[in-house]
């Protein structure tokens, strides 16, 4: 139900008894805990801390938490913290459609988008499942028409290329998913335009044919400045190539939006408008109509498998006891490192080239959600919140920033992701086995390190010795899937969504607004008008004035 901030009575994390207990455990055990020694002391450690998720199709993903800086007492206290922070209460409120995004008075209901069991899911007393299903059915019909060639351009030719124009969640999700599931691609090529930099759309328009290109304009309000500017540029280009006949637009443009008036004004047939509700946040929107480019690219059946994979993790997150709840454990470990070890970053390194955009996607999910300094009690936090998430695919990353991870002065908790089965098992799986050997070796090396005696035994002497020492004891979580399928990818994304949720619930912040993006947009509108004339600018600080005036001189 709609309400004011009903979550302000949730306590600050530092007020919880388990928080103080964890601080004492960190001082007494955590900061000196040696994972290599923990394995020597406890032969069951791996079996205790490795958890397996079974997907809806029977496939599995293994999450190995055993190389983390925890023991049974620390883990039990972290779970105690989750209970005291009422993580499950907030989780249940989210799944019940309550307005847990209280600053915008909205439900947070992206989980309803992957409700393929079609169970009733209500917001403000209204079951949204039929509406979600209707949009999906519309997406299915449209995507199958385009993919089959039944849908034709204005000259009667089949569509060959799809250009998705969006930004933020309307871009990052579809870009990442289409790259990750490229193996499942069909007859269409997809392109993405997001940046207001004219180079982005110019380079795409160079390689597409107006007779065979479908543009998807992805903006819930149909007023997002960057998206509408790019969409108008695409429309002007299209009209200039097609005799300026406005009626041709309907065959080549569709809208992922809810603003019927603006969509119609643009020239798009509102029959080709795919909507989604305000309870779908941008960074959670790939499951919605925003995923139309994905459905066009990989086919609707694969898109539905993607949804079902996420649904399987939702079910696990809701039904599994805290001790075995995989996303909850991932979130608790993040809090442990952030707030007790002082770790500021979180590395996600997929050992899979198809997942090369996965870290960029997770950056928005994590940092836009939990980059907050005000709690649900409307006071500034006195403790650290969101981590700086970064990553690149390995093994490339090993030849760039892994030096810092292994021998730098900062603790960088890391997630490594690998699929056992490659979609491209070339050279009799030679490449895959080399990739896997690095996946296992990097996690092992970060844990065991190399001490002075080992370095000397290898022949190093004098001042060279300390340079070759690896301290080890650097935490990793290894995530091993059977194969990167649509279902597996859906599960991985949902895992990180619920990790992010758990972090925010512990920190007592609203993970579902993003006020931090607003100020820059407001100021940009003011400055944009100043760039339309030749007058010298003096209205800002000296630095901003100087930069604007130099730009105008050089433009």
UniProtKB/Swiss-Prot annotation:
It catalyses: alpha-D-glucose 6-phosphate = beta-D-fructose 6-phosphate. Keywords: Cytoplasm, Gluconeogenesis, Glycolysis, Isomerase. Its main location: cytoplasm. GO terms for molecular function: carbohydrate derivative binding; glucose-6-phosphate isomerase activity; monosaccharide binding. The keyword Zinc does not apply. It is an enzyme of class 5 (isomerase). GO terms for biological process: gluconeogenesis; glucose 6-phosphate metabolic process; glycolytic process. One of its GO terms (cellular component) is cell surface. D-glucose 6-phosphate binds at residues 169-170, 219-224, 364, 368, 399, 521. The keyword Cytoplasm applies. Its EC number is 5.3.1.9. It is found in: Cytoplasm, Cytosol. In the cytoplasm, catalyzes the conversion of glucose-6-phosphate to fructose-6-phosphate, the second step in glycolysis, and the reverse reaction during gluconeogenesis. HAMAP family: G6P_isomerase (MF_00473). Homodimer. This is Glucose-6-phosphate isomerase. It comes from Candida glabrata (strain ATCC 2001 / BCRC 20586 / JCM 3761 / NBRC 0622 / NRRL Y-65 / CBS 138) (Yeast).
């Amino acid at each position: 139900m709609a309400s004011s901030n009903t979550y302000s009575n949730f306590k600050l994390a530092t007020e919880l008894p388990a928080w103080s207990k964890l601080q004492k455990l960190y001082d007494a055990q955590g900061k000196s805990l040696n994972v290599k020694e923990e394995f020597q002391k406890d032969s069951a450690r791996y079996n205790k801390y490795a958890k397996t998720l079974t997907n809806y199709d029977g496939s599995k993903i293994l999450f190995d938490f055993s190389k983390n800086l925890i023991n049974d007492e620390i883990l039990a206290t972290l779970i105690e913290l989750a209970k005291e922070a009422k993580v499950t209460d907030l989780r249940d409120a989210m799944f019940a459609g309550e307005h847990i995004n209280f600053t915008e008075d909205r439900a947070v209901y992206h989980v309803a988008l992957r409700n393929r069991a079609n169970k009733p899911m209500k917001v403000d007393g209204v079951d949204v499942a039929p509406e979600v299903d209707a949009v999906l059915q519309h997406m299915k019909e449209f995507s199958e028409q385009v993919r089959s060639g039944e849908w034709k351009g204005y000259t009667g030719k089949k569509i060959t290329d799809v250009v998705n124009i969006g930004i933020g969640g309307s871009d990052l999700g579809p870009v990442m998913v289409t790259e990750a599931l490229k193996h499942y691609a069909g007859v269409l090529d997809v392109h993405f335009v997001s940046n207001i930099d004219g180079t982005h759309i110019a380079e795409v328009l160079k390689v597409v044919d107006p007779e065979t290109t479908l543009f998807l304009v992805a903006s819930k309000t149909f007023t997002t400045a960057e998206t509408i500017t790019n969409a108008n540029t695409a429309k002007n280009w299209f009209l200039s190539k097609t005799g300026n006949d406005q009626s041709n637009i309907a065959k080549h443009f569709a809208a992922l939006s809810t603003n019927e008036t603006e969509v119609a004004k643009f020239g798009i047939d509102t029959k080709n408008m795919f909507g989604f509700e305000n309870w779908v946040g941008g960074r959670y929107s790939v499951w919605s109509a925003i995923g139309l480019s994905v459905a066009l690219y990989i086919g609707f059946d694969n898109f539905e498998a993607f949804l079902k994979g996420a649904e399987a993790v939702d079910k696990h997150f809701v039904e599994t006891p805290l001790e075995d709840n995989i996303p909850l454990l991932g979130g608790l470990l993040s809090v442990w490192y952030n707030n007790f070890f002082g770790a500021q970053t979180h590395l996600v390194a997929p050992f899979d080239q198809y997942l090369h955009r996965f870290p960029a996607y997770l950056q928005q999910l994590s940092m836009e959600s939990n980059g907050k300094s005000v709690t649900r009690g409307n006071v500034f936090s006195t403790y650290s919140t969101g981590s700086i998430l970064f990553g690149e695919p390995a093994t490339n990353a090993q030849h760039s920033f892994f030096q810092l991870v292994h021998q730098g002065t900062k603790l960088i908790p890391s997630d490594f992701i690998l699929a056992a089965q490659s979609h491209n098992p070339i050279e009799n799986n030679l490449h895959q086995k080399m990739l896997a050997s690095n996946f296992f070796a990097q996690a092992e090396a970060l844990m065991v390190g190399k001490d002075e005696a080992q370095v000397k035994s290898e022949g190093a002497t004098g001042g060279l010795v300390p340079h070759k020492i690896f301290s080890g004891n650097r935490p990793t979580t290894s995530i091993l899937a059977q194969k990167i399928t649509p279902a597996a990818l859906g599960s991985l994304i949902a895992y990180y969504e619920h990790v992010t949720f758990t972090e925010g619930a512990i920190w007592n912040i609203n993970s579902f607004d993003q006020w931090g993006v607003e100020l820059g947009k407001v100021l940009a509108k003011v400055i944009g008008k100043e760039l339309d004339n030749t007058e010298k600018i003096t209205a800002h600080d000296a630095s901003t004035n100087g930069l604007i005036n130099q730009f105008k001189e050089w433009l």
